[in-house]
């Protein structure tokens, strides 16, 4: 088996595992505000062979965290693409966690996982409030969307996008130009955060 074919098979297996783990189970029901972001028609994460795919994973296989516990993310695309990662908590408060102050470029190489935080670096993302936290992973072959160029204000690590997810979802879709010559893909994970 050639190295290229082996890499494609490995990515497909990783994507299938991520899709199986990335579903929202009964115990991880999204709020209406989170569901709006999860339902954006950006593009499937499992497009036919040759299409852009994005897979996100976390360091806890069961997707369960305690408040204050660090969350380590990994993201991978099957072709060079611009990537954004959104975190949406239960009340709809949405944060752009990638790109961020430490990682200003949204461009990822094909089949090279990005780890947040970098190995050996201090934690960047923590489980903040009890309930379900949604992570939405977005990729596009064009990088002209504001989603890939947004800079955090002041000394913050991340950009806060507000709580009006319906307006935000519409703005994201318009900015990505979904269906107008740009390949796009999305996937998501729902995490359970416990307060005890």
Predicted features by range, described:
Residues 13-22:
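Hydrophobic h-region of N-terminal signal peptides that target proteins for export
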Residues 9-12, 170:
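General helical structural elements
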Residues 1-10:
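Bacterial N-terminal signal peptides that target proteins for export
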